[in-house]
Amino acid sequence: MRVLGIETSCDETGIAIYDDKKGLLANQLYSQVKLHADYGGVVPELASRDHVRKTVPLIQAALKEAGLTASDIDAVAYTAGPGLVGALLVGATVGRSLAFAWTVPAIPVHHMEGHLLAPMLEDNPPDFPFVALLVSGGHTQLISVTGIGQYELLGESIDDAAGEAFDKTAKLLGLDYPGGPMLSKMASQGTAGRFVFPRPMTDRPGLDFSFSGLKTFAANTIRSNGDDEQTRADIARAFEDAVVDTLMIKCKRALESTGFKRLVMAGGVSANRTLRAKLAEMMQKRRGEVFYARPEFCTDNGAMIAYAGMVRFKAGVTADLGVTVRPRWPLAELPAA
């Protein structure tokens, strides 16, 4: 069984083909980073138009990469939400149209379920149950996962997501968009301990996050100190350490409250090397396991949508020919498979 996956929720056009016996057969990705760089962030209208230009050519490229034709595809999965409404509509419209033309089922996929299941693409996938840390530019959530669709929200950010805080702080430091990875690179040159940032909401019970205050703290620190390269690197180091420590503390609490021994982290920020190292160290001390996808599957991609589509297709999830997307879509609303 082969599923074509289409991802167009934000500023990456991702197309992939997943085979339930052979695994990933094709993976095509186009990033719009250069398109949005001059604006310092994603411009929704430009994102939608670029998806229109790139989606079909990337589908053709994926079929060629896999050595397949349209008749070899058994279902078409597409991201139905959450995300930018215009961008979502491009992928949903193309996906539904192809499914109709090819007389195969269309499968709407939740973007964050795609991220959550991305580690399943690896050679050593996690078993249920586990705690999932979903950490990206738009989401920071801790989820109890006991099966497909069996998701309980344990905690989430009450304001900025961790990835959003990374990008905003990077902008304060004069770094180009997208700033998160560039901030991490700068932080690697920083001196630990020169500046100490707070660890938000770790001084009280609960599993919620708050990162907007860190951005304000960073802005004040930047204004109060010199603008030389080393000072900026030291501030970047202090900021990254604060975010990573906060995420680690909350993950530890979530594991303690659930009693689970496995931790899965997914989403764009899960590619952060410092975060990976700290969580791996923590899980080793707890005699548990940590799982994450390879870096290219941490950010938005079609492979995770194709895989999640396969899982949902086998569970009997399909859609009619109407084009419906959900820019806001709580993960907990998904049915169990």
Swiss-Prot record:
Q: Which residues hold Fe cation?
A: 111, 115, 300
- Which compartment or compartments is the protein found in? Cytoplasm
Q: Which GO terms describe its cellular component?
A: cytoplasm
**Example GO molecular function term?**
iron ion binding
Which reactions fall under this protein's catalytic activity? L-threonylcarbamoyladenylate + adenosine(37) in tRNA = N(6)-L-threonylcarbamoyladenosine(37) in tRNA + AMP + H(+)
The UniProt note on the cofactor reads as follows: Binds 1 Fe(2+) ion per subunit.
Q: Which BP terms does GO give this entry?
A: tRNA threonylcarbamoyladenosine modification
Residues engaged in binding substrate: 134-138, 167, 180, 272
**What's the domain of life for this entry?**
Bacteria
Q: Which cofactor does it need?
A: Fe(2+)
Q: Which UniProt keywords apply?
A: Acyltransferase, Cytoplasm, Iron, Metal-binding, Transferase, tRNA processing
| Enzyme class, first EC level, given as a word | transferase
Q: Could you tell me what this protein does?
A: Required for the formation of a threonylcarbamoyl group on adenosine at position 37 (t(6)A37) in tRNAs that read codons beginning with adenine. Is involved in the transfer of the threonylcarbamoyl moiety of threonylcarbamoyl-AMP (TC-AMP) to the N6 group of A37, together with TsaE and TsaB. TsaD likely plays a direct catalytic role in this reaction.
Q: What is this protein called?
A: tRNA N6-adenosine threonylcarbamoyltransferase
Which species is this record about? Salmonella schwarzengrund (strain CVM19633)
- Gene that encodes it: tsaD
